[in-house]
Amino acid sequence: EDPGTMGPGNPAPSPDSDTPSDSSKGSDSNPALLLVGNAAPPVHKKDSVVWPAWVYCTRYSDRPSSGPRTRKLKKKKSEKEDKRPRTAFTAEQLQRLKAEFQANRYITEQRRQTLAQELSLNESQIKIWFQNKRAKIKKASGMKNGLALHLMAQGLYNHSTTTVQEKEESE
């Protein structure tokens, strides 16, 4: 099945419907009829809707994927498979991690190993702490990634979505 066309899993709007907004009215509005940013609506051909290829691109790839992603059902976890509880760092551990971060925002493998032994932590706990600290600073600063800004200017990167109906009501 062509990923650009709606198939059995993704029914096209009813034949008597001329616009995408007609099919988005009602309680069972079609989530496929979302517009990203100020993108043009899909092209209607006979009884199917052809979506532009970029709609099927994932956030990790600029190539179209095979279509809408599906989730696997979560299986019930046994007690052994439960998530590890959140690490509660001691005041001493936090003080050392913060001091290390002040010296260098990116920790080397050797330094991570040494610190893990000295603080009685796993290397992965230290690695994740550093990642989270960098992410927190980045989020707080409000700085945007240069590539993201460039793509947003071209209308290719905008994670906000509105339904067709909402867009018409706001005009």
Swiss-Prot record:
Keywords: Developmental protein, DNA-binding, Homeobox, Nucleus. Its main location: nucleus. Gene3D superfamilies: Homeodomain-like. The keyword Nucleus applies. One of its GO terms (cellular component) is nucleus. It is found in: Nucleus. CDD domains: homeodomain. Residues 15-29 have a biased composition (Low complexity). Residues 1-41, 60-86 are annotated as: Disordered. GO terms for molecular function: DNA-binding transcription factor activity, RNA polymerase II-specific; RNA polymerase II cis-regulatory region sequence-specific DNA binding. One of its GO terms (biological process) is neuron differentiation. The keyword DNA-binding applies. Residues 82-141 bind DNA. Belongs to the engrailed homeobox family. Required for proper formation of the apical ectodermal ridge and correct dorsal-ventral patterning in the limb. This is Homeobox protein engrailed-1-B. It comes from Xenopus laevis.
